């Protein structure tokens, strides 16, 4: 059995992924990986190398501090251990190419990966909660958007999801009570969307034309739209702790900024 030691100043996930990716090119090999993470002082490195020397094998390491990287290299040589630096040559090449020095902050890639997976999880949740789907999961949402049809619930939901927020949206339909689960959501998380009636008629009419349908039905009828919005306003008045956003002539980005301002005030870091 061959031993491979993975040394890192952060979690060690980066060096392990690189080595595992390389190992996929070799079939039926007996290899044991030993990960040693958060090595941020000379003492940490010396202790790790002493441990590796007990059962020698090759060492792969990622240390963004080139002083510590050089120390590891020298100490490994003293112990007659083979150590391969996976990150310093890359950092030097990129620094030369970009004309700026690296930040030398351990764990940046891990932080980026964590943020990426958080966003993907939020997007997946938001897609599944679109248009009132799975109301039993409303309590899991960071933000719940409510409003009549064509008030930008879905575009807003997806925009916020890509910022890492789990968003659900619930349609408000004239004469139909929203799902009971909506009233169980923490009030500060609920955002009611409202819009000018004439603007909503224009949006719905354009939608119908794009679908090659007549805009003369009740969906884009001004009187019907007024009734829907009045029903919506009455619902919002019953729940004064809900945030209400007027999305008339606002971009998704502008509406999202208003929502997040209230959200951040209610849930400060």
From Swiss-Prot:
Organism: Geotalea uraniireducens (strain Rf4)
Full protein name: Putative pyruvate, phosphate dikinase regulatory protein
Annotated family: Belongs to the pyruvate, phosphate/water dikinase regulatory protein family. PDRP subfamily.
InterPro entries given in the database record: Kinase-pyrophosphorylase, PPDK_reg
Role noted for this protein: Bifunctional serine/threonine kinase and phosphorylase involved in the regulation of the pyruvate, phosphate dikinase (PPDK) by catalyzing its phosphorylation/dephosphorylation.
EC number(s) from the headed UniProt entry: 2.7.11.32, 2.7.4.27
Amino-acid positions noted as binding ADP in the UniProt annotation, renumbered to this chain: 147-154
Pfam families, alphabetized: Kinase-PPPase
Catalytic activity: N(tele)-phospho-L-histidyl/L-threonyl-[pyruvate, phosphate dikinase] + ADP = N(tele)-phospho-L-histidyl/O-phospho-L-threonyl-[pyruvate, phosphate dikinase] + AMP + H(+); N(tele)-phospho-L-histidyl/O-phospho-L-threonyl-[pyruvate, phosphate dikinase] + phosphate + H(+) = N(tele)-phospho-L-histidyl/L-threonyl-[pyruvate, phosphate dikinase] + diphosphate
One example GO MF annotation: ATP binding
Keywords: Kinase, Nucleotide-binding, Serine/threonine-protein kinase, Transferase
């Amino acid at each position: 059995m061959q031993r491979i030691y993975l040394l890192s100043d952060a979690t060690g996930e980066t060096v392990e992924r690189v080595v595992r990716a390389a190992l996929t090119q070799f079939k039926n090999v007996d290899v044991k990986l030993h990960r040693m993470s958060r090595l941020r002082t000379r003492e940490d490195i010396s202790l790790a190398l002493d441990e590796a020397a007990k059962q020698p094998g090759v060492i792969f390491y990622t240390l963004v501090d080139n002083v510590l990287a050089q120390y590891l290299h020298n100490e490994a040589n003293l112990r007659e251990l083979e150590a391969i630096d996976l990150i310093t040559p890359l950092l030097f090449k990129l620094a030369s190419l970009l004309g700026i020095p690296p930040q030398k902050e351990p764990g940046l890639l891990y932080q980026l990966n964590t943020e990426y997976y958080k966003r993907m999880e939020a997007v997946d949740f938001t897609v599944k909660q679109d248009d009132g789907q799975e109301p039993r999961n409303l309590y899991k949402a960071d933000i719940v958007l409510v409003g009549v049809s064509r008030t930008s619930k879905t575009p807003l939901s997806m925009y916020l999801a890509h910022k890492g927020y789990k968003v659900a949206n619930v349609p408000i339909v004239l004469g139909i009570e929203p799902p009971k689960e909506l009233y169980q959501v923490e009030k500060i998380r609920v955002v009611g969307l409202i819009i000018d009636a004439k603007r909503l008629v224009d949006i719905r009419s354009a939608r119908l034309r794009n679908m090659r349908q007549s805009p003369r039905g009740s969906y884009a009828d001004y009187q019907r739209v007024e009734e829907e919005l009045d029903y919506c306003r009455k619902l919002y008045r019953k729940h004064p702790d809900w945030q209400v956003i007027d999305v008339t002539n606002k971009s998704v980005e502008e509406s999202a900024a208003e929502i997040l301002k209230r959200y951040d005030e209610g849930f400060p870091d």
